C-alpha cells in the first residue's frame, strides 16, 4: 500500500541558486517521509527507486545520492528505465515484491531539474554537479528502453511526440465531425479545464488563468507547434519538479505506527504495449487503452467509470481524449488532478508520479472512493492503468493485456509506396517564430494499406493549416516525399 506521498517544485531566476537534480529529488523524498507522520520511517526504507531522470543521468549513482541527501540508508538503489509509463511499472513491481516478501518498504521518486539547467546553459553558466567517489557502485537497473517507432517512421524523421499526437487529434476531429475551427474551440475548452485544475494545485508549474480563447488562438506567444496544437496545449518539460511515494507492507506500517487514515491501497493494475503507429488499424482510438482498461476493471471488480478521482497521462489532448473514450470515462469530465503536463508540468518520464502523489491526497480526503491513474510511454505505446482506494482488497492484482492487444486486427504498412493515396490524417509542423517546416501526412493507398508522406512545399503546407485535408489525395514517391493533388 501507499503510506506517504510528497512533491516539490522549485522556481528560480537566472543567477539564483538552484537545487541540482538529486537534491530536488531528495526534497520530494523528504516530503514523502514527513507525510507518513511517524518517526523512524527513513530507517525502514530498504529500496530507493528513481524513475529515469534525464537531468540526473550524469551521476554515477543518482538514487544512492538521493537516498543520502534524504537520510535514507537503503540497501538497494535502482534506476527504473523506460518512458512515461515507468512510474506505473515501478509501482506494480514494488507492490508485487512487497507481497512476495522480498521488500518491506520501497521509496519511488521521479523528477527533473530541466528548467534551471536549461536556464544556466543558455546563459553560459557552468552547472555544478556533486561528484561521487570513483568507486561508487552503479545502481541496479529495472526495465528496458525500447524503440517506440517503426523503421519507416524513423526513416522520415517522424519520431517525436509533437509529430505523432497531432495525427491522432486530426483523426479524432474527423470522428467527432468537427470543422477545423470547431475543433480548435473544442481543444481550447478542453485545455482550459486542465488550467483550472492547475490553479488549485500548489505544486503546478503554471497556475495562471488561461482561457479557452487564449489557448485556442495561435499568437506569437502561443504559436502552433504541430497543428492543431498551440504551445498552451502541449506538455511543458521546462520545469523543476519532483514527486515521491512510499510503498509499504501493512505489517511494517503498523509496526511504525503509521495511522491507517494515511493508507491508500493499489487495488489492481494492468499494462500492455501497442503496435507502432504504422500498423494501428485506426488513429482515433487505441486498442492498447481499451484492453488495458478492460483488464484493470475486471481485476478491480469495478468499471473504470466508477473512479471518483482520475488522473490520466496528459502530454497532449489526444492522449487524454483517447484514453478517456477507451476507458469509458467522460472526455469532457475532470481527467486530471494536477492540471496535466502543460499546466502542472511535464517532467519527462516522471509525470505519473505526480499523478500518484496527488491521488493519495485525493483519496485520503474522500475515504472509500476509488481513483484511477494512467501512465503512458511513447505515442500511446506503453500504458499502465492503476486503480486505488483507501478500502483494501484481499490482495493487489496485476495482469498484462498483451494477448488481447496482439490478437486485435491491425493495418499493413505500404513500405516504399509510390502513387496516389488518400489523406487519413495530417499535421503541419511549426518551429520558432511560427515558421512552417513541413506537413506530415498519413494516407491510405487504394488497397487500404497505410503510407507515410512529408510535404515540403511550404505553400501547400500553409494551405493545410486552416483547412480540412482529410480525404484529399496526395502523390507519394518511394522516398516518402508527398505532393498535393488539389
Where are these regions (language model features)?
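Conserved "HGTGT" condensation-loop signature of ketosynthase/thiolase-family condensing enzymes
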Residues: 1-79, 96-103, 107-239, 243-245, ...
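General structural concept
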Residues: 78-86
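An acidic, phosphate/nucleotide-engaging active-site surface
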Residues: 83, 92-97
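Active-site capping/gating regions of soluble enzymes
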Residues: 371-373
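Gly/Pro-rich active-site capping loops and adjacent beta-alpha segments
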Residues: 381
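A conserved active-site cap/scaffold subdomain adjacent to cofactor or substrate pockets
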Residues: 344-352, 363, 368
Amino acid at each position: 500500500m501507499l503510506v506517504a506521498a510528497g512533491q516539490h517544485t522549485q522556481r528560480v531566476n537566472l543567477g539564483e541558486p538552484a537545487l541540482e537534480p538529486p537534491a530536488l529529488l531528495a526534497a520530494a523524498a523528504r516530503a514523502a517521509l514527513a507525510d507518513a507522520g511517524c518517526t523512524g520511517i527513513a530507517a525502514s526504507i530498504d529500496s530507493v527507486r528513481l524513475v529515469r531522470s534525464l537531468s540526473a543521468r550524469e551521476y554515477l549513482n543518482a538514487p544512492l545520492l538521493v537516498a543520502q541527501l534524504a537520510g535514507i540508508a537503503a540497501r538497494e538503489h535502482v534506476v527504473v528505465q523506460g518512458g512515461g509509463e515507468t512510474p506505473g511499472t515501478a509501482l506494480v513491481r514494488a507492490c508485487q515484491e512487497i507481497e512476495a516478501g522480498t521488500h518491506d518498504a520501497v521509496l519511488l521518486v521521479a523528477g527533473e531539474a530541466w528548467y534551471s539547467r536549461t536556464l544556466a546553459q543558455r546563459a553560459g553558466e557552468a552547472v555544478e554537479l556533486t561528484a561521487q567517489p570513483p568507486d561508487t557502485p552503479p545502481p541496479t537497473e529495472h526495465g528496458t528502453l525500447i524503440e517506440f517507432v517503426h523503421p519507416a517512421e524513423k526513416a522520415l524523421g517522424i519520431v517525436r511526440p509533437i509529430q505523432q499526437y497531432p495525427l491522432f487529434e486530426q483523426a479524432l476531429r474527423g470522428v467527432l465531425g468537427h470543422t477545423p475551427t470547431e475543433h480548435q474551440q473544442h481543444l481550447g475548452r478542453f485545455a482550459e479545464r486542465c488550467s483550472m485544475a492547475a490553479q488549485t494545485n500548489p505544486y503546478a508549474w503554471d497556475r495562471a488563468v488561461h482561457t479557452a480563447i487564449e489557448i485556442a488562438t495561435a499568437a506569437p506567444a502561443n504559436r502552433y507547434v504541430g497543428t492543431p496544437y498551440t504551445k498552451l496545449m502541449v506538455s511543458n518539460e521546462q520545469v523543476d519538479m519532483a514527486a515521491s511515494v512510499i510503498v509499504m507492507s501493512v505489517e511494517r506500517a503498523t509496526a511504525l505506527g503509521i495511522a491507517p487514515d494515511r493508507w491508500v491501497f493499489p487495488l489492481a493494475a494492468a499494462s500492455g504495449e501497442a503496435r507502432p503507429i504504422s500498423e494501428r488499424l485506426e488513429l482515433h482510438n487505441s486498442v492498447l487503452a481499451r484492453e488495458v482498461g478492460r483488464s484493470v476493471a475486471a481485476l478491480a471488480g469495478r468499471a473504470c467509470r466508477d473512479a471518483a478521482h482520475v488522473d490520466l497521462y496528459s502530454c497532449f489532448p489526444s492522449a487524454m481524449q483517447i484514453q478517456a473514450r477507451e476507458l469509458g470515462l467522460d472526455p469532457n469530465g475532470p481527467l486530471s488532478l494536477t492540471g496535466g503536463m502543460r499546466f502542472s508540468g511535464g517532467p519527462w518520464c516522471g509525470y505519473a508520479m505526480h499523478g500518484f502523489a496527488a491521488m493519495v491526497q485525493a483519496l485520503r480526503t474522500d475515504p472509500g472512493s476509488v481513483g484511477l491513474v494512467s501512465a503512458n510511454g511513447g505515442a500511446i505505446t506503453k500504458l499502465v492503468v492503476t486503480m486505488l482506494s483507501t478500502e483494501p482488497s484481499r490482495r493487489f492484482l496485476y495482469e498484462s493485456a498483451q494477448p488481447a492487444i496482439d490478437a486485435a486486427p491491425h493495418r499493413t504498412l505500404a513500405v516504399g509506396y509510390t502513387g496516389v493515396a488518400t489523406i487519413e490524417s495530417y499535421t503541419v509542423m511549426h518551429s520558432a517564430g511560427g515558421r512552417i517546416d513541413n506537413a506530415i501526412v498519413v494516407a491510405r493507398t487504394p488497397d487500404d494499406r497505410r503510407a507515410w508522406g512529408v510535404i515540403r512545399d511550404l505553400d501547400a503546407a500553409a494551405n493545410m493549416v486552416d483547412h480540412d485535408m482529410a480525404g484529399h489525395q496526395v502523390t507519394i514517391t518511394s522516398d516518402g516525399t508527398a505532393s498535393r493533388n488539389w
